[in-house]
Amino acid sequence: MQVSVETTQGLGRRVTITIAADSIETAVKSELVNVAKKVRIDGFRKGKVPMNIVAQRYGASVRQDVLGDLMSRNFIDAIIKEKINPAGAPTYVPGEYKLGEDFTYSVEFEVYPEVELQGLEAIEVEKPIVEVTDADVDGMLDTLRKQQATWKEKDSAVEAEDRVTIDFTGSVDSEEFEGGKASDFVLAMGQGRMIPGFEDGIKGHKAGEEFTIDVTFPEEYHAENLKGKAAKFAINLKKVEERELPELTAEFIKRFGVEDGSVEGLRAEVRKNMERELKSAIRNRVKSQAIEGLVKANDIDVPAALIDSEIDVLRRQAAQRFGGNEKQALELPRELFEEQAKRRVVVGLLLGEVIRTNELKADEERVKGLIEEMASAYEDPKEVIEFYSKNKELMDNMRNVALEEQAVEAVLAKAKVTEKETTFNELMNQQA
């Protein structure tokens, strides 16, 4: 076997391989012997068919199969010998085959980039320092009460957190526009669902009033014909409701799994959940900064085959989220996923190099801790832990999570990490 390797473009490679004629003939004869042992031909007992008849009847197809097998096996031998690491599936380009002559073919593929990590010491990471305070717990209890609130109609004027039912008609330069009209529209105030100025124009009015408000569409508004335009909305305020918060009764508290129904028990449970969310948020915040710094410091070529593969993964995930099938997934435009796919491949290659250079392996104690942390959010943590322990795929996924964390920590060990005090709400709002 003769082998030559050339670079086509960037990460592209072409391996040209020549297989000696006698190697082909030896392999063909060997396979024909195997065929002769199995075939049945009228007039002959199984295994007793003369080789010339076997060759005459099956020679062409056997030779084709043998060539395909030799091409594959010789390519694998070649890349092992040349220490080449292909990325993605190779493309075989067969040359012209003539009986009794050497056979030359080529294989085209991409290789993984040679990554030499740099700039780790210049990466800057700001680690949030946060404590869950009693005031934070009070705020979360208010949120829980609001989520369980009922609405009661009122006669007084609209206030910041009320709910209103309105009819409205919007116009620009006295002309109504598409999507600017609705009847019995229910709007919870204070959630920022409408354009700036819309809610402010409703505050202070009472049910039964009809009025007009003036607003301006933002320059970044999605409808091109409305960007930056001044508009008027004719409003018919049909109903105003105020939120009635439930009291922290034992019955209410037990809805959240606090068996004794005490306020102290609920506060303890809420604090525990907040601290778990906080730990995850800090970890994610630090991780995202470390990875962003790693990517900026290391500009690497990315094999197109890996991007294509990642796009397929993202397509299928998107289709599953919206109830589509595999055929619909493949019809989604690749442009929707290309940037994200490339980013994921780059991050994977860089973290892979961090893992390789630091000779990292998944820490089983960390894996155990991650599973326990995740399970603590469920009603029966022991059941979840046991389920994971019996599922190899889930365990392998968690080992990958642990290994990624260890790689990020290796980056942080060399990066410039500073600490900054912040509040629970500030950090969680940044995550959102």
Swiss-Prot record:
One of its GO terms (molecular function) is peptidyl-prolyl cis-trans isomerase activity. Disulfide bonds: none annotated. Residues 161-246 form the PPIase FKBP-type domain. One of its GO terms (cellular component) is cytoplasm. Belongs to the FKBP-type PPIase family. Tig subfamily. The keyword NADP does not apply. Consists of 3 domains; the N-terminus binds the ribosome, the middle domain has PPIase activity, while the C-terminus has intrinsic chaperone activity on its own. SUPFAM superfamilies: FKBP-like, Triger factor/SurA peptide-binding domain-like, Trigger factor ribosome-binding domain. The lineage of its organism: Bacteria, Pseudomonadati, Pseudomonadota, Gammaproteobacteria, Enterobacterales. This is Trigger factor. Keywords: Cell cycle, Cell division, Chaperone, Cytoplasm, Isomerase, Rotamase. The keyword Chaperone applies.
